[in-house]
Amino acid sequence: MNRSEKPQLRATTVLGVIRNGKAALGSDGQMTLGNTVIKHSTKKIRRIQHANLITGFAGATADAVTLLDRFDEKLQAFGGQLERSAVELARDWRTDKYLRRLEAMLAVVSADKALIISGTGDVIEPEDGIVAIGSGSMYALSAARALIRYTDLSAREIVTESLKIAADICIYTNDHIVVEEV
């Protein structure tokens, strides 16, 4: 690494699944700095009780916590309306000079809705009720789609098994998995 290069903080695979009226969101616990694992049990999931939903983040931790706080404020301002709050956060993200520099993504699930709020201020609602962000997201997403299609596993079981598969493939993902349900 060149001395002028800033070491990149990498971490995370976050996966959310809605199935049979239940939603689960999970993540691994690994955080790396450059090519070194610096923590194995980072908490990347937050439950927002007053809105009955779960959020997960990928990217710079301080940036993600800032966005989570802003998202919680929007949820309170708009009476827990998930989509409206996400759109308002995205609007702020695009127009605010400070927020535009934040390097993070959010995954949000409720019992009937799954959203990704991207680092560019986009709000994405996947058609299949599966959200995946972070370094191992495509591995976890692929596994989750296969498990939904070919098994009767619960949302929690799909998230857990998919994250284990991602951990077997992605060097920035470990098997210290935390899953929450709504």
Curated annotation (Swiss-Prot):
PROSITE patterns: PROTEASOME_BETA_2. CDD domains: protease_HslV (cd01913). GO terms for biological process: proteolysis involved in protein catabolic process. It catalyses: ATP-dependent cleavage of peptide bonds with broad specificity. GO terms for cellular component: HslUV protease complex; proteasome core complex. It comes from the Bacteria. Keywords: Allosteric enzyme, Cytoplasm, Hydrolase, Metal-binding, Protease, Sodium, Threonine protease. The keyword Phosphoprotein does not apply. It is found in: Cytoplasm. The active site is at T12. Na(+) binds at A167, C170, T173. Belongs to the peptidase T1B family. HslV subfamily. A double ring-shaped homohexamer of HslV is capped on each side by a ring-shaped HslU homohexamer. The assembly of the HslU/HslV complex is dependent on binding of ATP. This is ATP-dependent protease subunit HslV. It comes from Prosthecochloris aestuarii (strain DSM 271 / SK 413).
